[in-house]
Structures are given as C-alpha cells and as structure tokens.
From Swiss-Prot:
Subcellular localization(s) per the UniProt record: Cytoplasm
Annotated spans, G5: 398-400
Stored CDD domains: IF2_eIF5B, IF2_mtIF2_II, mtIF2_IVc
Transmembrane region(s): none
Polar residues bias locations: 34-47, 101-129
Cysteine disulfide links: none
Key words of the record: Cytoplasm, GTP-binding, Initiation factor, Nucleotide-binding, Protein biosynthesis
Chain spans, region G3: 308-311
Biased amino acid composition, Basic residues: 131-150
Protein name: Translation initiation factor IF-2
Region (Disordered): 26-167
Gene that specifies this protein: infB
Principal location listed in the UniProt entry: cytoplasm
Binding site for GTP: 262-269, 308-312, 362-365
Length: 752
C-alpha cells in the first residue's frame, strides 16, 4: 500500500497536524513535518492513539460540568463573576488541547473563584482598575489563539493540492545546467530538484552547475529519458553556409553565375556592355542605369547572372576567403593578339577555382585575326576544343558588332544545364559579398549574391565579421525590391561595418542571435589578427609534412627567360619525398608582381624567382602576408634547396636582408674611376659596406660590391632615404639611367 502524508491523516482525524507530528515523534517514528510520509502500519497506530486520546478528553469534560452545576449554589457575587467569565469564554473559545490541559484543574479553579468571591464583589470601576490590565492581556492572547485556530480550520477544510505540469518525455540538456535550468524544463521548482538530488545523495544548491552524470541520474529517478543537446556555434557561419548549401529539399533550378575574364584590351568590357544593353534594356522600360558590378541577362526565358569583377586579383582574393561564387568562367581572348600574360593568369585562377571555362575568341572581324592560332596556344594549358577531341567550348565572337553573342549565351545555358545548378528558395538566405564600400549618405553598402534561400528586407543578417538588419535592398538598376531569390545580385544597406569582398553571409531567425554571432566573429577576427597564421615556407616545410598537413608543395616560378622557366619547372616536378610532390600552379617570365603574391597567398604556395626580383609593391605585400619568396641565380641551387627542405635537411642559412634602393638619375664618366652613378635613395638607406645588385626592368644584371659612396664630394658611410648620392660599383661600368641599385646584407638565420 502507498504511504500516507501526515497532513492527510490529521485531516481524517480532525486534529492539528502539529499535534499529530508530536504524537508520531513520541512513538519514535521520526516525522519531520506535516509533508512527511508514514507507512500504513504507522498510520493505523496513530489512528488508535488519536481515538483513545479523544475518549479520554471527552470523559474529562464530565467533572467540569458537574462542578459547574454545583457552583450555581454559590453567592451572588461569585455567580455574577461566573456569568461574566462564561460570556468571555463564549467569545474567545479555546481549542480542545487547552481544554484538556485545564480540565483536570477545573474544580480547583472554580474553588478559587468561590474562595475569592469577595474579591470580585467590588464595583465595576474597581474591577477595571485593579484587574483590567490582566483581562486585556488575556483577551489579546485569546484573540491571537482564535486566529490561529481559524487558519488551521481553513487549512484542514481546503488542503493545498499542488498541480504539477506533466513531465516531458525526453529531458534535453546541456552540460553545466543548474537546478533552475532543469526546473524550467521539467516544470518543477528548483527547490524540488535540489531535494530530489539530496535524496539521491547529491548535495547541491540551485545555482550550482551539474555534470552529465548527475543530470542523467535525475532523469532516471523521474522515469524519463535524458538526451544531451548538441550545442551549435552560432558564430560559425561557414558551417551554417555549408549546411544551407547541402540542403536538398525543395530545390529548384537557379540561374548560372558567370564571370568574364581576360587580358587587357581583349574586349572584356565591350562584351559585358554589349550583353547588358542588348539583353537588359529590352526588359527595362526607359533604359537602365547600372548601379552595381553585377547584373542579370534575360535570354530565351532564362536568366544568366554576370559578375563584373575589377580584375584577376579580386577574383583570387574572393577565393582566398573561401568564396567560390562563380559557376562558369568566360575567357575572352583576342584573335589578333592571341594568348597574353594576363590570359595565362586568368586560366590559372579559373583552374584553381575548378570552374568550367568557355573560351570566347573575340575580334574575329579585325584584319589579321587568326582564331586557329588562339586554339593552338590554349591547347598548351589543357583547353582543347571539342573539335579536337577535348571538352572545352570555343565560341568565335565580335563583341563590337554583337556577332555570335546569342551563340555564346546558348553555350552558357547549355553548360549550366549540364552542371544542374539548383537551390532551395524556401530557406534562410545565404550567399557571398561581391563588393562593398562606405557611402557617406547610406553608410555601409554591400553588393551580395544570394546563393541559397530568399533574402527579404528586414532580415537579421551576419556578413563576415559584422552584422545588421537589411534596411534597403536594390537591384542592378537602382530600383528597390523586397526580396531576392537564388543567384540574384542585390545591393543592401544596414550593416554595422563594411565587409570584405568574398565574405559569406547568413540570415538568422532573430536579431538577438545575429548580434551575438556577429560580435563573437568580430572578437575572433581580432584575436586571429594578433596571432597571424604563417604560410608554408621552405624553412617550416618539413615540420608541416611530418604533421601530415601537406601532400603537395604548391610553387610559383618566375624567371628571366622561358627556357629557364621550363628547365626549373621540369626539374622541380621530378622531386618526390615521402609521398609529397611539387605542384607548379603558375609559371611565367618577368619580375615577381603583386598578382603572383596574391595567388601564392590564396594557394599557400612558395614563389621561386630565377634571375628576377619582386617589385616594391609585391615585396611589401609578401612581407605583410608572410609569403616565402626564394631568389636564385643558379638553377641547381634552387632545385637542391627545395629538395633539402622536403627532406628536412636544411642547415642554417644566410638570408638576404634588403636595406635600401637607389634610383639612378644621371651618369658621369671618369677616366680613372669609370662610370659614376648619381641617384636618389628612394627607400631605406645605402651603406658603404653593403653588397649591391643592379636591376634593370625587373631583371638582375649584376651583383657585386660598392666601389665608393659619396655625398657632395665627401666619402660617407651611409646615405638615408630622400637624399642624393654618388656611387660606383666595383669592377662594373655598364650602368644606365633609371636602373635600380639594391643594397643588401646577408644575415644568418637558423632553420625554424
């Protein structure tokens, strides 16, 4: 049988719970309060004790009644006092417990009233004067006791019944919850949780964090299942972006996103303008005004999104930040010029992004155009047309006259159909930033491309390391719109700060979560800036290989002549150590420029220069981004250095430290001295004991030592930036105006 509560048993016996608690404790039952439980045997024992006590109490009332009858024969003064006393008892009736305690002394009290009857026989004024204070205290005591009695009677008549909400079927918890958190989930008070755990042998307070085992123990005691909730990092928008991308429910076909790339003056801008005006204006009444660097073209009842990127560097920067928003790359090559250096760069960037390439051979209307030569040159870069057995689409066009543009659009739609581009428009929007700027009138303005879901005005959004709410949204024509579907470029406002091109964005359900995610990402970005992650270098290559972090070593080769490029490339590709191979991602002739450094940063590559030097901008960019540039004049030294680095055998080496540059402004001839170069120190300083290198058009001509260094006919030890000087190079006279003389020192650097 089930246990019974003390207060329920007291209600049944019509006696105060406190009296029943005292009675149970006298029997050694160890009852603490009216909420304590007793066994059925103990309850029966208490019932018998309570009934026996009530019989005794009733019998004890009989002598009192007899005494009351006998007292009626007393004198008139005592009789008056008894009447007054009975009236007071009627108004202030005492509980049964008090009557029982006083019933044994009833006769004695009445006798005292008889013996002291003369004392009460005085006047009313005397009664109030001598005994008024005593009766007032007695009345107050009676009133207080009666109030408690009424409260107990109400409690006995209407006992408090706690109506708990039903327990959940599964307790979903996270490690570290306290009693208050669990109470909200279980629909129980924190005090009950603490008491329950106390009964289970766990001493806690309401604010103390609980471990996984304790929470599961509590759930087992309640008879429900416990399941740990997986905490999602709301600031990890990259994972959220991937989850949105991988959501295959309710997917529909979306427009293709196309980027047009090519060499300068090959007609890229003309092609974009022709497509925009011929296929957009017919759908826009009154013409258009291009507002952003992205637009959509209507063709054959389908949409194609074109991105007008400012250059290859921007394309690579976006890919370096993880944004691969391009589906198809259109490579524009002029039929009269053929493949040019920027054409090769565009090919390498597109191949690194793993996007299909459609070749648009432009300017076929010009005299001297030779499309077949373009096809032959592109075949060297694995761009083989379908006519030759390859899989690359070639289209011969004339952007100036609009010839075969429809065929180009047909090929884009065909390629998009083969790619099966789909997106879910019914989920939260996610996408990437194409470009961003700070507008004085509107604040932070960002051009974004929606890749998944539908973006609405008013959506809470996190973009890169900033957040906000979409305040306004305009299309490429400057017209305000309320929503943007997948593959639609729009310009939005409402962000707290200006994001960077290539940053991803994700829409959240509420602004509070978006704010928390944005602030956390900004904090992490600041911490990451303080502890910048270094790129791979030949010094740390072997340690990186041992950790299993590298399977290939990406290398960019720049040399003074094509023969050196090919020889160095072939030799490096033959090196293979412990399953790690060399991957030549770009090779070209000329000085190391900014584009090479940008590509190295995006691909985590090492740049090897043979008889060439980096430009000033490229060197600054490489230093700021920790890009490893290795310069050599002997091809075998370059090969040996890479091989030793892969084998982990690099010894401490002397590293070159450039201390200054001098630009030659004027040349003087002296019969005894030779050629004297007069110039300006453009950066750093030049010292008398420094080694020098003569660079002409980015190519190293000579390396040696200074013969002399003078300023105003005086020999000096050094000349700083911004001052003119005269110098000679020992045993070398072939110096020309506009040459650059680099001063450097060799510094011993241990291998890291």
């Amino acid at each position: 049988m089930a246990k019974e509560r003390i207060y329920e048993l007291a209600k049944e016996l019509k006696m105060p719970s406190k009296d029943l608690v005292n009675m149970a404790n006298r029997q050694g039952m160890g009852v603490k309060s009216h909420m304590s439980s007793v066994t059925p045997d103990q309850a029966q024992q208490l019932r018998q004790l309570a009934k026996g006590g009530q019989k005794t109490t009733n019998n004890q009332h009989q002598p009192v009644k007899k005494n009351d009858g006998h007292n009626k024969q007393n004198n008139h003064q005592a009789q008056n006092h008894n009447q007054h006393h009975d009236h007071d008892k009627t108004q202030n009736e005492r509980p049964q417990k008090k009557n029982n305690s006083r019933s044994n002394n009833g006769t004695k009290d009445n006798n005292q009233h008889q013996n002291n009857g003369g004392r009460f026989g005085g006047s009313l004024n005397n009664d109030q004067g001598r005994n008024g204070k005593r009766f007032n205290k007695k009345n107050k005591k009676n009133k207080k006791h009666n109030k408690n009695k009424r409260l107990r009677e109400v409690a006995h008549k209407q006992p408090t019944q706690r109506k708990d909400k039903p327990l959940p079927e599964v307790l979903e918890y996270t490690d570290g919850m306290n009693a208050q958190d669990l109470g909200k989930i279980l629909h129980r008070s924190p005090a009950e949780i603490v008491k329950k755990l106390f009964m289970l042998g766990v001493m806690i307070n309401q604010n103390q964090s609980l471990d996984k085992d304790t929470i599961e123990l509590l759930a087992t005691d309640y008879g429900i299942e416990a399941k740990e909730k997986v905490q999602v990092d709301v600031s990890d928008i990259d994972k959220m972006f991937e989850d949105e991308q991988n959501n295959t429910e309710h997917q529909v076909t979306r427009p293709a996103v196309v980027t047009v790339m090519g060499h300068v003056d090959h007609g890229k801008t003309t092609l974009l303008d022709k497509l925009r005006h011929s296929h957009v204006t017919e759908h826009e009444a009154g013409g258009i005004t291009q507002e952003i660097g992205a637009y959509q073209v209507h063709y054959n009842d389908q949409l194609i999104t074109f991105l007008d990127t400012p250059g290859h560097a921007a394309f690579t920067e976006m890919r370096a930040r993880g944004a691969n928003i391009t589906d198809i790359t259109v490579l524009v090559v002029a039929a009269d010029d053929g493949v040019m250096p920027q054409t090769v760069e565009a090919i390498h960037h597109a191949q690194a992004a793993q996007t299909p390439i459609i070749v648009a051979v432009n300017k076929i209307d010009k005299p001297g155009a030779n499309p077949d030569r373009v096809t032959e040159e592109l075949a060297k870069y694995n761009l083989i047309p379908e006519d030759w057995g390859g899989d690359t689409i070639f289209v011969k066009i004339s952007a100036k006259f609009g010839k075969n543009l429809d065929e180009l659009l047909d090929m884009i739609l065909l390629q998009a159909e083969m790619l099966e581009l789909k997106a879910n428009p019914d989920q939260n929007a996610a996408g990437s930033v194409v470009e961003a700027r700070l507008d004085q009138g509107r604040g932070s303005v960002a051009t974004v491309l929606v890749q998944q879901g539908t973006l609405h005005v008013g959506d809470p959004i996190v973009v890169g390391n900033t957040f906000g709410r979409v305040r306004t949204m305009t299309n490429e024509n400057g017209r305000r719109i309320k929503e943007a579907t997948p593959s639609t470029p729009v310009e939005i406002t409402g962000l707290n700060e200006v994001p960077e091109a290539g940053d991803r964005f994700v829409v959240f359900d509420d602004e509070k979560t978006a704010r928390a995610a944005g602030e956390e990402r900004a904090k992490r970005a600041m911490d990451k800036e303080r502890q910048k992650t270094s790129h791979v270098t030949l010094d740390n290559l072997f340690a990186t290989m041992k950790k299993g972090q590298m399977k290939t070593l990406p290398i960019i080769i720049k040399a003074d002549v094509q023969g050196s490029v090919e020889a160095l490339s072939q030799s490096l590709q033959k090196i293979k150590v412990d399953g790690v191979r060399v991957d030549i991602i770009h090779q070209a002739v000329g000085a190391i420029n900014q584009s090479d450094v940008t590509l190295a940063e995006a691909s985590n590559a090492v740049i090897i220069g043979f008889n060439v030097r980096p430009t000033a901008v490229a060197k600054t960019l490489a230093d700021s981004n920790s890009i490893d540039i290795r310069l050599h004049r002997v091809i075998y030294d370059a090969i040996e250095e890479v091989e030793d680095a892969m084998k982990g055998m690099l010894e401490p080496v002397y590293k070159e430290e450039t201390i200054g540059q001098v630009e030659v402004r004027q040349i003087y001839k002296a019969s005894k001295v030779g050629t004297i170069a007069g110039g300006m120190v453009t950066s750093g300083k030049i010292t008398r004991d420094a080694k020098v290198r003569l660079v002409r058009d980015g190519v190293v001509i000579y390396e040696g030592e200074l013969g002399s260094l003078k300023r105003f006919k005086d020999d000096v030890k050094e000349v700083k930036q911004g001052y003119e000087c005269g110098l000679t190079i020992e045993n070398y006279n072939d110096i020309k105006e506009m040459d650059v003389i680099e001063a450097y020192k060799m510094k011993e650097v241990p291998v890291k």
